A protein has these predicted regions:
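N-terminal secretory signal peptides
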Residues: 1-3, 16
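Active-site acidic/histidine proton-transfer and metal-coordination neighborhood
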Residues: 11-19, 23-28, 86-89, 105-200, ...
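Boundary/entry segment of secreted carbohydrate-active catalytic domains
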Residues: 27-47
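Acidic/histidine-rich catalytic cores of soluble enzymes
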Residues: 31, 36, 63-64, 158-279
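Short, acidic/polar
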Residues: 44-56, 111-121, 210-217, 282
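Catalytic domains of carbohydrate-active enzymes, especially glycoside hydrolases
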Residues: 51-69
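Conserved, mostly hydrophobic/aromatic
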Residues: 56, 64, 87, 123, ...
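Glycine-rich, proline-tolerant flexible connector loops at the mouths of alpha/beta enzymes
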Residues: 65-84, 138-139
Length: 329
């Protein structure tokens, strides 16, 4: 079939609108910039780091929070320089590290500070300036000892002071099963650390599962937030196990018949959902961010990707575009 020149030119006039619609589900990354967490791909053995970066590029999540530092370099058979190159060629950024080396043992003080320094030196090479600090897990020795909580707060002040000398900020990541998980523990911690030295890097799912008012907590500590996780969740009683779906490879393509979830399942993991599928009030959170003029990263930390990382991050990106960006870009 022949197409007239007039028809061809007319079709060209529609191209910008078509392209705009095609891109409309990709987050704008203006005031709020969106990141993924490397942790998810630990549930997809054999994934190459370049596959992960391609998912980020194609779904509009240009940042990554690194996990398992420094061991992830060996796990993914990549050097720091190679990672820098692969990120740069795709226009992506390493934005922080999930830092799990905080110790309440006074004898470990210097090693703890040295480990924090190493993590921030690594991040500085990528232009990052924030360290996400996890409190010690309750299964670690010494966390229930008298004075342990105070020792943790003291160490965080020291980490925050160190961060300031390196041009960094540091903030606490609340987490179930760790020393800081409930509203009372968060309040106690935030009151004990120096607000000039140490901030808050909240996780919405862990707030929700701990029974917190998510929007209220973000609003309460908004002046101390430099980084946060948007992660959706349902309380266990409201979260029946999802029906088994075909597994998906790291790039979102079908890869067998087993459910695409971590081996062995797990109660906590099954309470985590794509943005908008759970109970967290993200529009409320976003209105707080708008009110404070937040400019920074939000990590959409998927602990499970039932349809595969590519498909689930596309779903999350669509939620960001359709539900959150009308509130605040």
């Amino acid at each position: 079939m022949k197409i007239s020149r007039r028809s061809f030119l007319a079709s060209l006039s529609l191209l910008p609108a078509v392209l705009a619609r095609a891109q409309s589900q990709v987050p704008a990354n203006k005031n709020v910039k969106w990141a993924v967490s490397l942790n998810l791909w630990g549930y997809f053995p054999g994934t190459k780091i370049t596959d992960i970066l391609d998912v980020m590029r194609d779904t509009g999540f240009p940042g990554i929070r690194l996990t398992g530092f420094p061991g992830f370099l060996n796990k993914y058979s990549i050097t720091q320089a190679q990672l820098h190159t692969e990120l740069s060629k795709r226009g992506l950024s390493a934005v922080t590290i999930s830092w799990n080396s905080l110790s309440v043992d006074p004898a470990m003080r210097q090693q703890t500070l040295d480990n924090a320094r190493d993590a921030m030196k690594f991040l500085a090479d990528f232009g990052a300036n924030h360290l996400v600090v996890f409190s010690p897990g309750l299964n670690r020795g010494g966390t229930a000892a008298p004075g342990a909580f105070e020792e943790m707060c003291k160490r965080c002040n020291e980490i925050g002071e160190l961060a300031g000398t390196m041009g960094f900020t540091a903030g606490l990541h609340n987490h179930m099963g760790q020393m800081v998980q409930t509203r009372e523990q968060i309040d106690q911690f935030m009151a004990a650390v120096d607000p000039k030295l140490f901030g808050f890097s909240p996780d919405t799912a862990h707030l929700h599962l701990a029974g917190c008012d998510v929007v209220g907590m973000i609003d309460k500590y908004k002046s101390r937030i430099k980084f946060l996780d948007y992660k959706d969740a349902k309380l266990p009683a409201a979260a029946p196990a999802p029906a088994a779906a075909p597994a998906a490879a790291a790039n979102g393509t079908a890869a067998g018949t087993a459910a695409a979830r971590p081996a062995g399942g797990g109660g906590f993991i099954q309470n985590i959902y794509d943005l908008g599928d759970g109970e967290v009030d993200f529009p409320g959170c976003h209105r707080v961010l708008k009110g404070m003029g937040y400019k920074g990263w939000i990590c959409v930390d998927l602990d499970i990707a039932r349809l595969g990382p590519m498909a689930d991050y596309k779903r999350c990106g669509a939620y960001v575009v359709n539900k959150l960006e009308p509130i605040y870009l």
